[in-house]
Curated annotation (Swiss-Prot):
Taxonomic source organism: Streptomyces orinoci (Streptoverticillium orinoci)
Molecular functions (GO terms): serine-type endopeptidase inhibitor activity
Site (Reactive bond): 69-70
InterPro entries to which the protein is assigned, alphabetical: Prot_inh_I16_SSI, Prot_inh_SSI_I16_CS, Subtilisin_inhibitor, Subtilisin_inhibitor-like_sf
Matching HAMAP family: SSI
Cellular localization per UniProt: Secreted
GO CC term, one of those recorded: extracellular region
Complex formation: Homodimer.
Superkingdom of this protein's organism: Bacteria
The name this protein goes by in its record: Protease inhibitor SIL-V2
Length: 109
């Protein structure tokens, strides 16, 4: 194959762990072309490539974002393969506002 495989299942759940009640899930494949059930696969793949697959960069909060301090956790996960490497990523945001304030749209679905 000319391309290293990149196929992920992305989830968003309510709660503070990866086993939280999953509310939404999509698939994202980036090679050879962006595809899957992600609503903006092309942009999500471009952001993943730009971050070199470092999901922590994608879940960082945009500068100048203001959210309440309420604890209403939202957990996002990415499981699968990115450029041939196994991925098992999980990140918990303090609340939905913080999740929406992430720098990327990879987990916007």
């Amino acid at each position: 194959s000319l391309y290293a495989p990149s196929a992920l299942v992305l989830t968003i759940g309510q709660g503070d762990s990866a086993s939280a009640g999953i509310q939404r899930a999509v698939t994202l494949s980036c090679m050879p072309t962006p595809s899957g059930t992600h609503p903006d696969a092309r942009d999500a793949c471009a952001q993943l490539r730009q971050a070199d697959g470092k999901f922590d960069e994608l879940t960082a909060t945009k500068a100048g974002t203001y959210c309440t301090k309420e604890w209403n956790p939202v957990t996002v996960t990415a499981t699968g393969v990115w450029e041939g490497q196994r991925v098992n990523y999980s990140h918990t945001f303090g609340n939905p506002c913080m999740a929406k304030a992430a720098k990327s749209t990879v987990f916007s679905f």
